[in-house]
């Protein structure tokens, strides 16, 4: 894709900017003449040089008789227009090349995405162990609340943590399920 756009840019630079090679759409004099007396308005296009871009050289055939030509030409607005179709073509080729490259990149990512996001068996096992551990600790906390008093400092801290976790869980249920404020 980069090679194609590079070739297009080099081709554009190597094309000689000669006015003789340009088509009538590239260089033109456009005269817009409004309605005049019983003559309807009209748009005239002519391939003439910039110095000849006026009503007398562009408007052919002249729709008014000889003595009204000057008054008619004063109403007409003539503009010289020049564009480079080669540059337009090069820009379109570059644009299409970029869009094509992005589409290819998107297709590549769609093909590679399942390989990248493949679930890792080890992380799934760790996640399942954490869930099981949480469930066991909740059950142990519920049992320890009603059971005999803990003897060691470590067991007391664990018991306090379990009570705190149960309290937080209860508050979550109250707030999210029952939509009540914290007490």
Curated annotation (Swiss-Prot):
Segment forming the signal sequence: 1-20
GO cellular-component term (any): lysosomal membrane
Cell compartment(s), UniProt: Lysosome membrane; Late endosome membrane; Endosome, Multivesicular body membrane
Topological domain ranges for the Extracellular compartment: 21-89
Glycosylation sites: 21, 38, 47
Membrane topology reported for the UniProt record: Single-pass type I membrane protein
Cytoplasmic domain ranges by topology: 111-183
A Gene Ontology biological process term: regulation of protein catabolic process
Organism: Homo sapiens (Human)
Main location, first listed in the record: membrane
Subunit: Interacts with the v-ATPase accessory protein ATP6AP2 and with the v-ATPase complex subunit ATP6V0D1; these interactions lead to the assembly of the v-ATPase complex.
PTM annotation: N-glycosylated.
UniProt modified residues of type Phosphoserine: 137, 144
Protein name: Proton-transporting V-type ATPase complex assembly regulator TMEM9
Keywords for the protein's UniProt record, in alphabetical order: Endosome, Glycoprotein, Lysosome, Membrane, Phosphoprotein, Protein transport, Signal, Transmembrane, Transmembrane helix, Transport
Ranges that cross the membrane: 90-110
Tissues expressing this chain: Highly expressed in adrenal gland, thyroid gland, testis, ovary and prostate. Moderate expression in trachea, spinal cord, stomach, colon, small intestine and spleen. Low expression in bone marrow, lymph node, thymus and peripheral blood lymphocytes. Expression is detected in hematopoietic cell lines including those of myeloid, erythroid, B- and T-cell origin.
Entry's free-text remark on domains: The transmembrane domain (TMD) is essential for the interaction with ATP6AP2.
Family, per entry: Belongs to the TMEM9 family.
Free-text function comment from the UniProt entry: Transmembrane protein that binds to and facilitates the assembly of lysosomal proton-transporting V-type ATPase (v-ATPase), resulting in enhanced lysosomal acidification and trafficking. By bringing the v-ATPase accessory protein ATP6AP2 and the v-ATPase subunit ATP6V0D1 together, allows v-ATPase complex formation and activation. TMEM9-controlled vesicular acidification induces hyperactivation of Wnt/beta-catenin signaling, involved in development, tissue homeostasis and tissue regeneration, through lysosomal degradation of adenomatous polyposis coli/APC.
């Amino acid at each position: 894709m980069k090679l194609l756009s590079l070739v297009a840019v080099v081709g554009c630079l190597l094309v000689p900017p000669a006015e003789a090679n340009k088509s009538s759409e590239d260089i033109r004099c456009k005269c817009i003449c409004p309605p005049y007396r019983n003559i309807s308005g009209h748009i005239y296009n002519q391939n003439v040089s910039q110095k000849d871009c006026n009503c007398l050289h562009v408007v052919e055939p002249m729709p008014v008789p000889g003595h009204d030509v000057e008054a008619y030409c004063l109403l007409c607005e003539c503009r010289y227009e020049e564009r480079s179709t080669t540059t337009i073509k090069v820009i379109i080729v570059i644009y299409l090349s970029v869009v094509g490259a992005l589409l290819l990149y998107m297709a590549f990512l769609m093909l590679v995405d399942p390989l990248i996001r493949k679930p890792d068996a080890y992380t799934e096992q760790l996640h399942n162990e954490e869930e099981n551990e949480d469930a066991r600790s909740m059950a142990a906390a519920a049992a320890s609340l009603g059971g005999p008093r803990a003897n060691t400092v470590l067991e007391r801290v664990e018991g306090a943590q379990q009570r705190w976790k149960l309290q937080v869980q209860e508050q979550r249920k109250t707030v999210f399920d029952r939509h009540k404020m914290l007490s």
